[in-house]
């Protein structure tokens, strides 16, 4: 059985929107951000900063 904090803050993977490579693993708070997370991060495959979107 998962702990209560794991239910509220699940682990998510962020993928580059241009090359689709999954570069980052992080957690998010479901209560504050129920929709998909989008962050501008550096992609080593593209060699530049791109938008990384939450994958399921």
From Swiss-Prot:
Keywords: Ribonucleoprotein, Ribosomal protein
PROSITE patterns membership: RIBOSOMAL_L33 (PS00582)
GO CC annotation: cytoplasm; ribonucleoprotein complex; ribosome
Pfam families: Ribosomal_L33
A single GO BP: translation
GO MF entries: structural constituent of ribosome
Protein family per UniProt: Belongs to the bacterial ribosomal protein bL33 family.
Protein name, UniProt field: Large ribosomal subunit protein bL33
């Amino acid at each position: 059985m998962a702990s209560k904090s794991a239910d509220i803050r699940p682990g998510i993977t962020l993928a580059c929107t241009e090359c689709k490579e999954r570069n980052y693993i992080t957690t998010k708070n479901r209560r504050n951000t129920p929709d998909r997370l989008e962050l501008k991060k550096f992609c080593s495959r593209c060699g530049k900063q791109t938008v990384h979107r939450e994958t399921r």
